[in-house]
């Protein structure tokens, strides 16, 4: 891999790996090698959830568990992680197999999000919990400053349903129109039909649930509720 690209990524992350093989593994999708990033992703997912939960607990001493859970879900969900990946220009660093390269896997939100979690796992193994906690909080600084408890933190499907129910309109319908990829790495495409919108709204995700949430979020934007 191009060392210039790797060094640029490490500068954006604010961390230089001592064990460069951990960085390369974190950037490797299972389509490219048997030594891929899924175990690191598993580890990073748990670390991210802990760090964000701990920070929310510290910042919001009077907020109940339900609101904190919703805020955490907003901060660690796939599209937030994919946004962060794009801020790091992570797409140009991914190691993908020929099929994923051809299908534009370097742009796919699920792959970008998973790679951020794998990087978190890799940095933890390369350093310690205090280092990765400091980095995560730095990456999330603006998002943590902006987030607040309340209805805004409900997931998109819930907010869309409550909006329609409040106006006595039919509930949205979700239809799977395409499933791509192998069983371990699928991408679902959903059409969501919503009263008040002329065309179905499209959402994609690595599971049906995530695709439905993505479609609901697009519907909320079209209804100008986002």
Swiss-Prot record:
Disulfide bonds: none annotated. CDD domains: DSRM_RNAse_III_family, RIBOc. GO terms for molecular function: double-stranded RNA binding; metal ion binding; ribonuclease III activity; rRNA binding. Its cofactor is Mg(2+). Mg(2+) binds at residues 41, 114, 117. One of its GO terms (biological process) is mRNA processing. Its EC number is 3.1.26.3. It is found in: Cytoplasm. PROSITE patterns: DS_RBD, RNASE_3_1, RNASE_3_2. Keywords: Cytoplasm, Endonuclease, Hydrolase, Magnesium, Metal-binding, mRNA processing, Nuclease, RNA-binding, rRNA processing, rRNA-binding, tRNA processing. SMART domains: DSRM (SM00358), RIBOc (SM00535). Pfam families: dsrm (PF00035), Ribonucleas_3_3 (PF14622). It comes from the Bacteria. Residues 6-128 form the RNase III domain. It catalyses: Endonucleolytic cleavage to 5'-phosphomonoester. InterPro entries: dsRBD_dom (IPR014720), RNase_III (IPR011907), RNase_III_dom (IPR000999), RNase_III_sf (IPR036389). The active site is at residues 45, 117. Residues 155-225 form the DRBM domain. Belongs to the ribonuclease III family. Homodimer. Digests double-stranded RNA. Involved in the processing of primary rRNA transcript to yield the immediate precursors to the large and small rRNAs (23S and 16S). Processes some mRNAs, and tRNAs when they are encoded in the rRNA operon. Processes pre-crRNA and tracrRNA of type II CRISPR loci if present in the organism. This is Ribonuclease 3. It comes from Yersinia enterocolitica serotype O:8 / biotype 1B (strain NCTC 13174 / 8081). The gene is rnc.
């Amino acid at each position: 891999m191009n060392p210039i690209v790797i060094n640029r990524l490490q500068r954006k992350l604010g961390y230089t790996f001592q064990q460069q093989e951990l960085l390369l593994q974190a950037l490797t999708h299972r389509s490219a090698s048997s030594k891929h990033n899924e175990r690191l992703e598993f580890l990073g997912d748990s670390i991210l959830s802990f760090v964000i939960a701990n920070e929310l607990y510290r910042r919001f001493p009077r907020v109940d568990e339900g609101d904190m859970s919703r805020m955490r879900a907003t901060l660690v969900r796939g599209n937030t992680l994919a946004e962060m990946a794009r801020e790091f220009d992570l797409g140009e660093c991914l190691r993908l197999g020929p099929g994923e390269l051809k299908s534009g896997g370097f742009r796919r939100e699920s792959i970008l999000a998973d790679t951020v979690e794998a990087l978190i796992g890799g940095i933890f193994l390369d350093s310690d919990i205090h280092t990765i906690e400091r980095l995560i909080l730095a990456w999330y600084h603006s998002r943590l400053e902006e987030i607040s408890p309340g209805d805004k933190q409900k997931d998109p499907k819930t907010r869309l349903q409550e909006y329609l129910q409040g106006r006595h309109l039919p509930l949205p319908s979700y239809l799977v129109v395409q499933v791509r990829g192998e069983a371990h790495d699928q991408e679902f495409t959903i059409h969501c039909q919503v009263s008040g919108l002329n065309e179905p709204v499209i959402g994609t995700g690595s599971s049906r649930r995530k695709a439905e949430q993505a479609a609901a979020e697009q519907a909320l934007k079209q209804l100008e509720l986002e």
